[in-house]
């Protein structure tokens, strides 16, 4: 059976339950944590394998072109945590720490880097630097608006 057929079957099975609870998430993690309950075991296993294959030798996750990218790493980590793929966390932690501490991040990569850093490493001098950089970035963006 093809991936999308299995996915559709899993979604239908979930939707057809007699009692469907509405989800009002405040965070992405609680929603993703429900994925293993919604999808069948074969699909969860396939997604786990995909996540592991997408991690590069650098420790981050590959974009569509195969290059390691913070944006893709953010989503890779969210999915890995939801599906309990713990093997990817330590290499990702090292990748994020190295990249954030040794690069000048801007735009979406700044935000992804800050989220990943606080999630994987925690609070320290670097996370405070990222926080100040984001505040500065937001102030500049607001002041440039008409």
Predicted regions and their residues:
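Preference for long, amphipathic alpha-helical scaffolds in soluble/luminal domains
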Residues: 1-146
């Amino acid at each position: 059976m093809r991936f999308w057929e299995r996915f559709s079957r899993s979604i239908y099975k979930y939707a057809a339950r007699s009692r469907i609870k509405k989800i009002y998430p405040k965070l992405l993690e609680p929603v993703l944590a429900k994925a293993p309950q919604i999808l069948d075991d074969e699909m969860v296993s396939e997604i786990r394998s995909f996540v592991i294959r997408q991690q590069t030798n650098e420790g981050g996750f590959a974009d569509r072109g195969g290059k390691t990218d913070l944006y893709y790493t953010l989503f890779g980590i969210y999915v890995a945590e939801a599906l309990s793929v713990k093997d990817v966390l330590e290499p990702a932690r090292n990748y994020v720490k190295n990249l954030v501490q040794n690069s000048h991040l801007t735009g979406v990569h700044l935000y992804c880097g800050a989220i990943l850093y606080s999630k994987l490493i925690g609070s320290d001098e670097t996370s405070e630097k990222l926080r100040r950089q984001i505040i500065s970035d937001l102030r500049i963006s607001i002041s440039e608006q008409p």
